[in-house]
């Protein structure tokens, strides 16, 4: 997952029809912090920082829309989709519970200026690396806009660990230290100014740590895994590195006050957009990934199409490859369709950047087709002209809120 490709989904269950901030537990972690000054402006990270982990949320029961998997010894195993859906349900329940228990934020005197400086820096980074999305965030309320910037920057920094200039030096222990630092951040002990912006965000909104930890798990997977036996394995990877972004954003962006959508359905739509984006990344970057020795395509589906890793590394576009790619693109589009249903349920200010993101990313699939499925030597991209056309289209569609049919997780 290239850092420059991080595309945020902006679904939210947060506060319906209002701009009041949810505030953390009664002891208000931020008010307990010592006054500190942060001067760390770089995206890259010092990992000499650790803390104590937190316990996972208690399991909840809810109908599951995925199939079970039988392992080689005949035992029934839980599919990746079901595991991810369990996380979705926990996040939805957490939002509902925490919104019922919101309290009044008590900022400590002297911290406002430092936090404004930290958030401004996050906005600058977002503007530099995700210009279209950044413009869309300017329509949001200041509190939501700043929170999304903070989440974006944390995700980008995390992605840089395994995809940036220092990626070859990153070890599992470095990711362990990054996760420990995340836990400190959620406990109100930020290490630098960029951490401070996210630490403040999780005080102001009911953002849970689990999706952040899951993204780090995706980075661990990238260090040790370069093949995926089937779509079940690939689905879990896509959730870790991209679906999590949707779950992080859900408590922040805001739902239309007239929406009848359930919390779970909005989370599902957010998850679907993350999965769709990552599948699109994978299909676009086949050639780039093979040069790194990686194949992010289901091995069993390659075999069914009469293809092998050798064919991928040879990089020749054949009829077998075209047919294989048609099925992969069809799957990605199905996830985009599910995601689009949920965007209609966002409040108007939050719909535009998310819808623009979806329209632009979905066009990458069109470009792969236009390149005759040659994603070995050609990198599909959306031209500036098409991007400029998509932005007003997204804005116009964001003004309309059709009624939503509750989406379910889709796994072709």
Swiss-Prot record:
| Family listed | Belongs to the phytoene/squalene synthase family.
In which organism is this protein found?
Oncidium hybrid cultivar (Orchid)
Q: Which transformation does this protein catalyse, written as a reaction?
A: 2 (2E,6E,10E)-geranylgeranyl diphosphate = 15-cis-phytoene + 2 diphosphate
What PANTHER family does its record include? BIFUNCTIONAL LYCOPENE CYCLASE/PHYTOENE SYNTHASE
Question: Which domain of life does this protein belong to?
Answer: Eukaryota
Name the UniProt record assigns to this protein: Phytoene synthase, chloroplastic
Entry's localization field: Plastid, Chloroplast
Keyword tags: Carotenoid biosynthesis, Chloroplast, Isoprene biosynthesis, Plastid, Transferase, Transit peptide
One Pfam family named in its UniProt record: SQS_PSY
Q: Which gene encodes it?
A: PSY
Instruction: Please provide, in alphabetical order, the Gene Ontology terms of the cellular component aspect for this entry.
Output: plastoglobule
């Amino acid at each position: 997952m290239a850092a420059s490709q991080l595309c945020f989904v902006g679904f939210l269950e947060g506060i319906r029809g209002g701009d009041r901030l949810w505030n953390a537990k009664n002891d208000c972690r931020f008010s307990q912090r010592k006054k500190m000054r942060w001067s760390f402006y770089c995206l890259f990270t010092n990992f000499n920082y650790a803390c104590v982990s937190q316990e996972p949320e208690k399991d909840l029961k809810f109908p599951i829309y995925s199939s079970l998997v039988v392992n080689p010894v005949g035992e029934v195993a839980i599919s990746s989709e079901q595991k991810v859906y369990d996380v979705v349900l926990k996040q939805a329940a957490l939002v509902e519970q925490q919104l019922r228990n919101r309290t009044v934020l008590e900022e400590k005197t002297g911290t406002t200026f430092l936090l404004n400086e930290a958030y401004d820096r996050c906005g600058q980074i977002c503007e530099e690396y995700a210009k279209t999305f950044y413009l869309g965030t300017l329509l949001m309320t200041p509190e939501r806009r700043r929170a999304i910037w903070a989440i974006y920057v944390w995700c980008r920094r995390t992605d840089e660990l395994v995809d940036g200039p220092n990626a070859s030096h990153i070890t599992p222990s470095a990711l362990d230290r990054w996760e420990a630092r995340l836990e400190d951040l959620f406990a109100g002990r930020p290490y630098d100014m960029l951490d401070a912006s996210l630490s403040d965000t999780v005080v102001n909104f009911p953002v849970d740590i689990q999706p952040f930890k899951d993204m780090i798990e995706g980075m661990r997977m990238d260090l040790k895994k370069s093949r995926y036996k089937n779509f079940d394995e690939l689905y879990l990877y896509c959730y870790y590195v991209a679906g999590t972004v949707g779950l992080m954003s859900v408590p922040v962006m805001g739902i239309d006050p007239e929406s009848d959508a359930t919390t779970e359905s909005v989370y599902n739509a957010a998850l679907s957009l993350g999965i769709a984006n990552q599948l699109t990344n994978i299909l676009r970057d086949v050639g780039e990934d093979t040069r790194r020795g990686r194949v992010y395509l289901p091995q069993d589906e390659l075999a069914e199409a009469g293809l092998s890793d050798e064919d991928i590394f040879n990089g020749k576009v054949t009829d077998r490859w075209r047919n294989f790619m048609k099925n992969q693109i069809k799957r990605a589009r199905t996830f985009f369709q599910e995601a689009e249903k949920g965007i209609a349920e966002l409040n108007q200010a939050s719909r535009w950047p998310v819808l623009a993101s979806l329209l632009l990313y979905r066009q990458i699939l069109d470009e792969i087709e236009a390149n005759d499925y040659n994603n070995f030597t050609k990198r599909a991209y959306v031209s500036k002209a098409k991007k400029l056309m998509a932005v007003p289209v997204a804005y116009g569609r964001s003004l309309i809120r059709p009624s939503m049919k509750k989406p379910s997780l889709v796994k072709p």
